[in-house]
């Protein structure tokens, strides 16, 4: 039976159905906004206490039913109800209602005709865990031989939920489900299904059951809690909510990193290793604690193998200018791949010009995968160093790093692994990989800019002369001779970037608390969903379709320049990179000069991907002007 819904008096600043983001708003976002407006209006808990009603034919409340003062700012910015909602949004709201009585009260005070379940009224099959509890992350899905790589084809999703609901367990880690959903939350979802007449655009038939494309797999974190950890995600760009899809360029920073930097400057700021006062001790302790955090993150054998640098670019240059200059000569060979960022090409070109060594390049196939057969043909006794990326910044391809390293070592070559694009997506174990050097930048893994890491095997670092000279890296200086400190100090000349090293330590600790296995599983599903959405757009060509890839969705759209697409998306609040991504050789391998590159992180959502796809479709059909 169709219910008759009365009209609602006009409320200032409510979005209309013509708003491009109208269909992208989840119920969770709606209720969060309502709660914020209640708090801004100064409504007490008593005023907003729920009054459960059982009305056979619920109707929309009039403005007089709103438990807030009637002023233009009291309920401003409340988004209009969406015209469709997916299983994920409904499950998130149901879980939030059960876990947050304040949120339930806010919903009930605004929409009194909705009867919300409470945790006390629902039979409990298992306790509802906290919304953010990384320690309960289930066992990871099957993993490819490469460390931390989860292949697309190894994450099956059954067509129906299990009889016990959607609770994830270590013994059943491939089921459909939403994080920690159990029977209690399932009952709440059913209650929400039966009360949707307060949203006139919604019908129970328009809401899918708890199966489908948005299964969360073995994910063990609450995406909305994660997003609340990143203040910048609340920003608006051109009047739209910020959608940050430029994560391959840089990642956003969680509040814990911002707070750690602030604490350092307020309570610990000093130079390190060279004073007897209290602040110097605090600063030194914080700096060296960050080094230990990096060691733990990479599973290095010792903190003496961890060198702080400005970033990946400086780390590669350090190896090329120090170890390379000491060990390469005319006739020797350096091997890189077509996938490399310019920062892993130019230093080796310069070294080749200086020493007479030859630069060899491993080709890739039409999917963007390294040709291992061709790589083996390039290796010989002349090969002195192989330097390659673990994840392509332009295509997202995950290279078979362990195999590449093992083959190089058979010929006595050293190996540098560029982890700039891998550390935020995959668990890295430098001892298991057996790489000689591993490099990455802090800002790519939710840390500050201007700080990075060079990991090197201790025997290599000890045998390498420093690239730069100055204070902090010497043991003794006379006019006749200088004795250098052992590694890592010998490579950290001058006053280092102390505060940002401390901030990097906080970022890595944050990532490890969530768990890179959980992050990889969630991002895998984002990538699958995004690939499916973009593949359906007429004229769109995805660039880089390797079966093992990280969260990059480079594409071109027939008839439109990448730069124009990037500008149009920016007007919709969507940040992507449009250009050559400092990787011109690999784009030219595909006959291109530039692409549009959406790149994902674990704070992105399925709804954001749908917003992106909808905007691209509007560009393609001409309804979104360039």
From Swiss-Prot:
Stored Pfam families: Aminotran_5
Keyword terms: Encapsulin nanocompartment, Plasmid, Pyridoxal phosphate, Transferase
Region spans: Cysteine desulfurase domain: 226-626
Disulfide bonds: none
Stretches the record annotates as Cargo-loading domain: 1-225
PTM-bearing positions, type N6-(pyridoxal phosphate)lysine: 444
Documented EC number(s): 2.8.1.7
Regulation: Encapsulated enzyme is 7-fold more active than encapsulated enzyme.
Active-site residues annotated for this sequence: 582 (cysteine persulfide intermediate)
Domain of life: Bacteria
Gene Ontology molecular functions: cysteine desulfurase activity; pyridoxal phosphate binding
Subcellular compartments: Encapsulin nanocompartment
GO biological process, one term: cysteine metabolic process
InterPro entries for this protein: Aminotrans_V_dom (IPR000192), Cys_dSase_SufS (IPR010970), PyrdxlP-dep_Trfase (IPR015424), PyrdxlP-dep_Trfase_major (IPR015421), PyrdxlP-dep_Trfase_small (IPR015422)
Annotated stretches, region: Disordered: 1-21, 41-64
Induction statement: Present in when grown in sulfur-containing media, induced 42-fold after 48 hours of sulfur starvation (at protein level).
Enzyme class: transferase
Free-text function comment from the UniProt entry: Cargo protein of a type 2A encapsulin nanocompartment probably involved in sulfur metabolism. Cysteine desulfurases mobilize the sulfur from L-cysteine to yield L-alanine, an essential step in sulfur metabolism for biosynthesis of a variety of sulfur-containing biomolecules.
Family according to the record: Belongs to the class-V pyridoxal-phosphate-dependent aminotransferase family. Csd subfamily.
Matching PANTHER family: CYSTEINE DESULFURASE (PTHR43586), CYSTEINE DESULFURASE 1, CHLOROPLASTIC (PTHR43586:SF8)
Subunit structure: There are 1-2 copies of this protein in each type 2A encapsulin shell.
Domain notes: Has a disordered N-terminal domain of about 225 residues that functions as a cargo-loading domain (tested with GFP) and a conserved C-terminal cysteine desulfurase domain. The first 100 residues also function as a cargo-loading domain but not as well as the first 225 residues.
Protein name per its UniProtKB record: Cysteine desulfurase
Annotated gene: cyd
